[in-house]
Amino acid sequence: VSGSDWNKSAITEKLENMGADIVYGHGAVNEDGINKASLVVYTAAAKADNPEIVLAKEKGIRLIDRAEFLGAIMKNYKHAVGVSGTHGKTTTTSMLAHALIGANLDPTISVGGELDLIGGNIRTGKSDYFVTEACEYTNSFLKFYPTIALITNVEEDHLDFFSGIDEIIASFRQFAYLTKDIGYVVAMGGDKNVQKVLENADDLNIITYGMESKFDYYPENIVYHAGFPSFDVMKNGEKVCHIKLNVPGEHNILNSLATVAVCNLMGVDAETAAKGIETFKGTHRRFEKKGFLNGAVVIDDYAHH
């Protein structure tokens, strides 16, 4: 395995320690790696004039983008979850990792941030359970094969690619329809654009969650302790578990409701899912509290939006 990146990081150093040959710098070319490669996988951020892509084409080496590669892997799993949405993908994927690992399902996980539980952003399991973030940028998630498509919210983003919100909604609708006849869509019912995504989608199996009782999954008896919520999870009017979160904010109530809903569809009961969710204390660079400076709280949060 070989590759290149702009900068050295903990992830690339980990790969190097495992034997990967990596070169660094803008426009870096791992010529030796390309010469030996039978397949070149590139990120959506790498354009056609990237020197390694140009070299691979010249040598007739097969090229596929990361989404297509991940989709090809995903296709082999009986239970495959694609976690999509403008916000909340990494956090919800991480919550699912905690819940499914806690349920001893030995899942394969691909997450967009570093999660301490799995020692990075990838976990290779030996079961039929696969969970990955599903990003809409360049319509990447349309190359996936989800049996469960989770949509946390839909807003204007990646406007260097999409023309506007209507095109984004259309893309998410195509993603939802990847589950037609084979699985489920789990959707945040209170989001107006998610509602547009699923408008008249009567031929899909849709499970909703939100803050109101009109949705399939919703919270009751919410209490905050220093910003950290605890609440009862209700499913179609019945309490199925209680969750005491170790991450702050109402948005994480929604993320945990989505996690319980997906877990239920994968055969994990709500109580077991709740125990796993409660062990989740956040991922790196997702509203990560780093400490204090001159009396101010320092938060590290990675975001384009």
Labelled PLM ranges:
Residues 8, 22, 74-78, 299, ...:
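Structural/interface elements that position substrates and couple domains in central-metabolism enzymes
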Residues 2, 108, 207:
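Conserved beta-strand positions in the Rossmann-like core of class I SAM-dependent methyltransferases
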Residues 43, 162-169, 183-187, 199-305:
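Adenine nucleotide phosphate-binding catalytic loops in nucleotide-utilizing enzymes
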Residues 4-6, 132, 187, 299-300:
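Active-site flanking residues adjacent to catalytic metal/cofactor-binding acidic residues
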Residues 5-7, 113, 190-191, 212, ...:
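Residues in the short beta-alpha loop(s) of Rossmann-like NAD(P)-binding domains
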Residues 24, 30-37, 44-189, 193-204, ...:
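Phosphate-binding loop of NTP-binding sites
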Residues 2-14:
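NAD(P)-binding Rossmann-fold cofactor-contacting core
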